[in-house]
Each structure stands twice: as C-alpha cells, then as structure tokens.
Amino acid sequence: MLSTTRLLALSTLLTPILAHIALWDPAMYGWTDDPNQWDPVVPLMHLPFDQWWFHGYMNVPPAEGKFMTLPSGGTYNGQVACNKALTKYGQNPAQQTGIYACDGPTDQGGIGAMHTSDKWNSPDPVDLKGCAIAIAYESDPTKIKPEDFTVISVNHKCVWFKDIDFQIPSDLPPCPPGGCHCLWEWIHADDAGSEQLFHLAYRCTVEGATGTRPLPSHSQQMSC
C-alpha cells in the first residue's frame, strides 16, 4: 500500500497532467526544454487581451530557426495533449504509449481535460467541437492583430485522440522572409464543464507554397 507521503507526492505530479489541452510543437511561443511542461494547457477565458493573446507568451518566442512546417497540399501531423510528457517531446517512452489526448489514474482516464460528455474509450465520440489552425502572413508578432488571422484547417474530431491531422490547402501563398505566424484554437462547449478558450501561437511556414492569390478576408465563425 502506498504511504500517505507517496500518495501526496503522486497527486502533486498528476495535477498538471489533469489540466486541459495544447497542440505541442517546438515552434510554439512559450515552449521550454522541460519535458514535463504543462503551463500552455491553462485555459484563458475572461483574461484581459494581453494575457490571453499569444497565451501571454509574446515575449517567449520559439528558438531561432524553429518553425511549425505546414506542407502545401499535404497534412500537418501534430499531437495534442494535456502535458508535454505524453507526447513525442517527453523523455519517458512509457508515458507516450496512450492514444488519447490525456491520460488519468481512474477508469475515466483523461476525459476531464477533453471537456466532452462522451464516455471514455468511446470508439466514435460525438460531443467534440473541433479545433483549428489559422495563419497570418506577418513575421513580426508585435504587428499582428486577431483580425489578421485566417482559419485554413479544421479537425472536427478534436480533442480526443493525441495524434491529430490538419489538411493544409494547396494554394496558400509563400510566407514572407522570417516566416508566418499560426494559431491553434479550441473553444469547447459548456456541457462538460464551463466554457473555455484555448489559444496558442507558433512561428510557422508553408512548405512548397506556390499560391499567388492572397487569402480571403476573414469572417466571424457561425454555427451551421
């Protein structure tokens, strides 16, 4: 039987892992070398603009030369998880074997972090609101405004599985020198916990881009 001290230590270690979800990529603003990093999964609802914009990491850019690479006409293969340790960027392979975006110590797994009314291990979850990648053709993050971003790819089965694909359009124009900036956005409904906003920024580039037309003007998302 575990001692009280060991139980308390275990609960402390699990607390961040039972938080929420992020799309993990080394080109993320706020990325650190900590293989157990969890702070990018903290939700942002009701925070002032300067605290939620770029997740508050405007002054913590990715390392020089790091880009989220979006293959023109191809697929961006990413990983969403409630802790970096569960992804390929962790240091313990035994923690990376799960197929879901979060793990947990009970028979409910990591369902709480996914904010869905679907049952754990459901083969065909239906209460998922999807997440998206948006792009802005500006290399200087201080010049970017929310309205500069255009959504270019949506995954409607997000978040559920850890491995996630985003189909990238084939007609995107090349990024400017210094690259583009991308966002990962997820707003889950309030039917499984309070409504929350998840928002992370990345330095990105479009590999093999040959498009010549600028992206269409953005419009406010609507239910359909």
Feature-to-residue mapping (PLM):
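Peripheral, solvent-exposed domain-edge segments
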Residues: 2-6, 15-167, 177, 192-224
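Membrane-associated scaffolding surfaces of BAR-superfamily helical dimers
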Residues: 11
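Extracellular beta-strand-rich recognition modules
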Residues: 78-80, 182-186
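Flexible gly/pro/ser-rich segments immediately N-terminal to CXXCH heme-c attachment motifs
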Residues: 171
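Short glycine/proline/serine/threonine-rich loop/turn segments at secondary-structure transition edges
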Residues: 174-180
